[in-house]
Amino acid sequence: MKRSPEMTTLLKIALSAAAVAALSIAQASDAGAQAAQSYEAPPKEANAIFANYRFRNGETLPELGLNYTTLGQPRRNSHGAIDNAVLMLHWTSASGQALLTPEFRTALFAPGAPFDVTRYFVILPDAIGHGRSSKPSDGLRAAFPRYGYGDMVDLQHKLVTEVLGITRLRAIVGISMGCMNAWQWAEAYPDAMDGIMPIACFPSPITGRNLLWRRMVVDAIKSDPAWAGGNYKQQPPSATNGLAIVRLMIDGVPRLQEAAATTESADAFVRSVREQAVRVDANDVIYALEASRDFDTRPGLSRVKAKVLAVNFADDEFYRDSLQTLQHDIRIVPGARFVVRDVSDGSAGHLSMTRPALWADQARDFLAWLAEKP
């Protein structure tokens, strides 16, 4: 069959279009494969060492280790600066590993999730005194420097800027203790981030129920003869007993009603809590609980430059919404927003913070807000 010039031209166009389409499909497939590979890649863990580190109170450590984990890859803009870094900060007596559970990875880090690690470079440090970072139980015990929350933030800042070479974070997300650290970041390093998302705290000092349980646990441990001034040979029983009682205060009333519906289930709950508590070190607990003594960001709230979306929970007995403390304090912060989540299926009081599916929508809204043009 003889083709006309017009038919030949049309055939070439069709073949060209098919080739482009095939290439586009292949590229999309490659991009999808790369994204899946990035998400499925194991977290990278490292330990930053700071020699002769001086704490805010003047005490020093010859060598301080700050452990951290990263997810995803750093992305550089046209100026060569990393522009997709998100710092996520854990709660008291936890570590960055607590944010790597399947629940967190699915709700926050999976493809299409708010902090999709195919798009963001996520940094999960172990705060000083926690996880695999330097802490009293490493050997110094009660001779370990008395760190505060301010020291935690200073070390996180050194990690981000000096070790990872990041001049500005896209966001900081902090949970409970990490929530307070996020407020401190915004106050101490106002140009270091685009926004912060503090979850489950107030920007004002710890008071009331939250302060009392800390003092009660510390007092119980220090009053125990087995504590021996911090030089114990076996963990003081008071540490386990004290931390077991804390669960009554931080868990949600509806959840406890369900978990302790019978004597048998209540006993099982107590055994479970005790089994978790025996894995902690008494000195580490004391240091972690007393570290909050220097927390008060109220004096600098009016100077915060970052966008702020604070998230609290209506059934959190540590940070009672009826006190209206968050509403009062956040008015001082320029342009800040807040959400107090109502009680819903899955709510767990203060521990709602550990259920990211409950606040993933707020995280998505927060990132959309950061993306808005000024």
Residue positions per predicted region:
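Catalytic-loop region of hydrolases
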Residues: A31-L87, G96-A98, P102, P374
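Alpha/beta-hydrolase
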Residues: S38-E40, E45, M216-F318
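N-terminal cap/lid subdomain of alpha/beta-hydrolase-fold enzymes
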Residues: T69-D138
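Conserved acidic catalytic loop of the alpha/beta-hydrolase fold
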Residues: G150-R170
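Conserved hydrolase catalytic core segment
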Residues: R168-T207
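Flexible "cap/lid" loop of the alpha/beta hydrolase fold
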Residues: M197-A228
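Conserved loop-alpha-helix segment in the C-terminal half of the alpha/beta-hydrolase fold
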Residues: L309, A314-R337
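Catalytic active-site module of serine/aspartate enzymes centered on a nucleophile-bearing elbow/loop
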Residues: A336-P374
